[in-house]
Amino acid sequence: MGPWFWTFDALGVPDWVAQRLWWGTLLFAAISGVAYLLRLFRLPALAVWPAALAYGLSPYAVAYLGRLSGVLLPAIGLPWLLGLTISSIRVRSWRHPALFALVVATVGSVNLTALALVGVAPLLWVLFALVSREAPPRRILGAVARIGLLATLTSAWWLAGLTVQATHGIDIVRYSESAEVVARTSTAFEVVRGLGYWFFYGGDKLELWIEPSFQY
C-alpha cells in the first residue's frame, strides 16, 4: 500500500482517487485470479465468471474493502498462488515460480498467519499431484524447490523485520487481538453469513469501530 499511495501522491493525484483505484485494483485482482485458476481446469466461461465474481464481491470482501483493505490481500492472492502452483508443476520453467514469489511478496507482508493459511491450498495441490501422478515426482519437487527459493528471496525484507519484532519487540497482539478475542466471533454461523472477522464487532467508549455493523 505504501508504494501505491506514494506514487499517486508524487503524481499529484488526489487521495480519494488513489484510494478508489486501489479498491478497484484489489477487486480486479481477486476476480481475475479466480478466473485464471478455473481456466486451468478448462471450465466454460459460463461457469468461470459467476464463480469469479462471487469470490471477488463476497460479503467479506465488500465489508472490509473500505476500512481494512490490507486484511484482504492474502485472500486475494489465494487463487493466484494455487493457479501458479498448478502451472509451475505442469510447465517446467522459472516463469510461474517467479510470479508465485512476486504474489507472496505482495500479499504476505501484512499478516504471516493469513499467508500460512492460504498457503495450505498450494501445499494440498502438491500432495494431490504426487498422489495422482499428475506429473513425474521429480518435476513436482523441482517446482516446489523453485517456488520455495524465489519466495524466500522476495520475502526476505519483511521476514527479517518480523524476526526482529518477534525477538525484541513488544507482544502487541496479546493486547490488541488475542486468540480468545479473535476466535470468539469466528463461529460457524457468522462465517456462513460472510462475517466472523473480530474487528467487525469491536468498539470502544465512544463508538463502534464499524458503525454499520450494529444492525447485523
Enumerate the language-model features and the residues they cover:
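Periplasmic/ER-lumenal interhelical loops and adjacent helix-loop junctions
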Residues: 1, 148-216
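Membrane-embedded helix bundles of polyisoprenyl
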Residues: 25-41, 46-131, 143-162, 168
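Conserved helix-loop functional segments at active or binding sites
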Residues: 9-13, 90-94, 208
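Extracellular/oxidizing-compartment recognition motifs
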Residues: 16, 41, 66-67, 142, ...
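Membrane-interfacial, low-structure loops and terminal tails that flank and connect transmembrane helices
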Residues: 133-141
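Short hydrophobic/aromatic helix or loop-helix immediately within or flanking a transmembrane segment
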Residues: 1-15, 107, 204
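Detector for conserved single-position "signature" residues within domains
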Residues: 22
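Juxtamembrane loop-transmembrane helix junctions in multi-pass integral membrane proteins
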Residues: 13-17, 43, 109, 139
